[in-house]
Structures are given as structure tokens and as C-alpha cells.
Curated annotation (Swiss-Prot):
Zn(2+) 1 binds at C33, C36, H57, C60. A zinc finger (PHD-type) spans 30-80. The keyword Transcription applies. This is PHD finger-containing protein 4. The gene is PHD4. Residues 146-161 have a biased composition (Low complexity). Residues 114-132 have a biased composition (Polar residues). Disruption phenotype: No obvious developmental defects. Plants missing all PHD finger-containing proteins (e.g. PHD1, PAIPP2/PHD2, AIPP2/PHD3, PHD4, PHD5 and PHD6) exhibit an increased expression of flowering genes leading to an early flowering phenotype under long-day conditions as well as growth retardation. InterPro entries: Znf_FYVE_PHD, Znf_RING/FYVE/PHD. GO terms for molecular function: zinc ion binding. Together with AIPP3/BDT1, cooperates to form a BAH-PHD bivalent histone reader complex able to read histone H3 lysine 27 trimethylation (H3K27me3) histone marks in order to regulate transcription, especially to prevent early flowering; promotes AIPP3/BDT1 binding to H3K27me3. Keywords: Metal-binding, Transcription, Transcription regulation, Zinc, Zinc-finger. Interacts directly with AIPP3/BDT1.
């Protein structure tokens, strides 16, 4: 007679393939979606690339996706700037003595932020660097064409007068 697991203790058929009673087999039970609590549609569940703990369906996530991305980062890991930016604070001494920590951020363009504290208050400066282009041209400054004074630079003969 077979029990709930399907194991028939009285059956001799396949006795060579059955496990001895002293061995334990483990079945991997995957964690359910943290939003809806369901294990259904396992092919549509994303697992956080960083913590490997958070699991969400692509249709339960805050931003709905069409397919499971190769690398998905959960909201908790996204909120931790050290993990997301994968960089150390710019100045270790200043970071230890200050409640404000500066991180280097990388997006479609390279952005370097430097936060410094002074007695007069906090100053924030940002430098944006565009990636080099094949044919860089000088920056053109728009000129006011409404007045006739600035239409053309003076010629050599006019500047000598």
C-alpha cells in the first residue's frame, strides 16, 4: 500500500532504485513572491541579483516588466547606496566624522559629486563629463541678433580708426 509520498513499502518492483531508510533526500523549496505570496508562475519570478533573497513576479513588481531581466536588483538593495554604486566613500576620514557620505554615481554619463562641509554651511558641486566624441566641436554661444551692433566683428580697418 502506498502512503502520501507515493512510496509503496510492500512493493519489490524498483527496490534497487529506492533509497535506503537512512538516507534523506532534500527537495529545494523556492521562496514565494514577496508581494503576492504565491509560488505560481515560477518562470515569471525575478530573484535579486545582489541579495539573492528577494523574489517578485514581473507583474507584482512596482515597475511591471514584460520578461525576467538578467540582473534585477530589489528595492531594499537599490536603497543601499554602497551596494548599488559599489564604491567606497570618497574621503574615509570625512565619512567617519560626518553624517553625510559622498558616493560616486555612474549613469548614462559620468557624474562626479563632491560634497564638502564648511563652517558656513554645506556646499555641493557636481562635474558632468560627457564621453569623448569622435568629432568634438567647440561650444557655440548664441548671439543676440536683435541689435545691429553685434552682427559682425569689426574688421581690421575699422578697429584701427
Amino acid at each position: 500500500m502506498a502512503d502520501e509520498s507515493g512510496y509503496d513499502a510492500g512493493s519489490d518492483a524498483g527496490s534497487d532504485a529506492s533509497l535506503p531508510s537512512s538516507e534523506i533526500s532534500f527537495v529545494e523549496v523556492k521562496k514565494p513572491c514577496e508581494v503576492c505570496g504565491s509560488n505560481a508562475n515560477d518562470h515569471a519570478i525575478m530573484t535579486c541579483f545582489l541579495c539573492r533573497d528577494t523574489r517578485e513576479h514581473i507583474y507584482c513588481a512596482r515597475v511591471h516588466l514584460r520578461s525576467v531581466p538578467r540582473m534585477w536588483i530589489c528595492e531594499e538593495c537599490r536603497m543601499n547606496p554602497v551596494v548599488v554604486n559599489n564604491v567606497a566613500p570618497v574621503d574615509q576620514e570625512a565619512a567617519a566624522s560626518s553624517s553625510r557620505i559622498t558616493y560616486q554615481v555612474a549613469d548614462s554619463e559620468v557624474v562626479n559629486q563632491t560634497m564638502t562641509s564648511s563652517d558656513s554651511g554645506n556646499q555641493i558641486s557636481a562635474t558632468h563629463q560627457q564621453p569623448p566624441q569622435a568629432h568634438a566641436s567647440p561650444v557655440a554661444v548664441p548671439m543676440d541678433t536683435s541689435s545691429s551692433d553685434n552682427q559682425q566683428p569689426p574688421s581690421d580697418s575699422e578697429s584701427a580708426i
